[in-house]
Amino acid sequence: MVIDKNKIEQAIRLFLEGIGEDPNREGLRDTPKRVAKMWEEFESYREMNMTIFEEVGSYDEMVVVRDIQFYSLCEHHLLPFFGKAHVAYIPDKKVCGLSKIVRVVNKFSYRPQVQERLTAEIAEYLEKELQPKGVAVVMEAVHLCMAMRGVRNPESITVTSKLTGRFLECQKTREEFLNLINSHKKM
């Protein structure tokens, strides 16, 4: 997707005027450019090469990367939601570098969306690229659209999950994953 920085700048200028602000005042003068640059940066996360290693007969146990910090925007109010993603897969002859898991989370996070779709997109992408025996994604997030407006409940955490393959079919595998991602939490 191509970012149209001029349209973003115009829209932000109109938005500021719409809420009664002067887009030419000192603190806001460069805001339209800053916002356009921010979206350009977000767009750069979408481009990534998934380096995959063929590991015939090698590691076939669960790989978990937990507590991946992520930031996204609620598509309904354009307010941030943020939290932690926990991602696992069980290799079937293919593995990827651990940093690629974080990059996949970033790839899908930096855009307006709902958490449910974000969770599913991460799992589906890993399923397609790695062709593993299973993928598990759990995301925990605070939604500012619920904290700052509406119900105004800043303490609530939304948890979504997407499980495929052995994580979905085998209770022991699912329990192992959940134990691994929760083992560090205080009781």
Swiss-Prot record:
The domain of life is: Bacteria
Q: Would I find GTP-binding among this entry's keywords?
A: yes
Q: Its Gene Ontology molecular function terms?
A: GTP binding; GTP cyclohydrolase I activity; zinc ion binding
Answer whether the UniProt record assigns the keyword Metal-binding to this protein: yes
Q: Which reaction does it catalyse?
A: GTP + H2O = 7,8-dihydroneopterin 3'-triphosphate + formate + H(+)
Principal EC category: hydrolase
User: Where along the chain is Zn(2+) bound?
Assistant: 74, 77, 145
Q: In which pathway does it act?
A: Cofactor biosynthesis; 7,8-dihydroneopterin triphosphate biosynthesis; 7,8-dihydroneopterin triphosphate from GTP: step 1/1
GO BP annotations, alphabetical order: one-carbon metabolic process; tetrahydrobiopterin biosynthetic process; tetrahydrofolate biosynthetic process
* Key words of the record: GTP-binding, Hydrolase, Metal-binding, Nucleotide-binding, One-carbon metabolism, Zinc
Q: Where is the secretion signal located? A: none
- Gene Ontology terms, cellular component aspect? cytoplasm
Q: Which Enzyme Commission number(s) are listed?
A: 3.5.4.16
Q: How does it assemble?
A: Homomer.
Q: Which family does it belong to?
A: Belongs to the GTP cyclohydrolase I family.
**Identification of the protein by name:** GTP cyclohydrolase 1
Protein's organism: Sulfurihydrogenibium sp. (strain YO3AOP1)
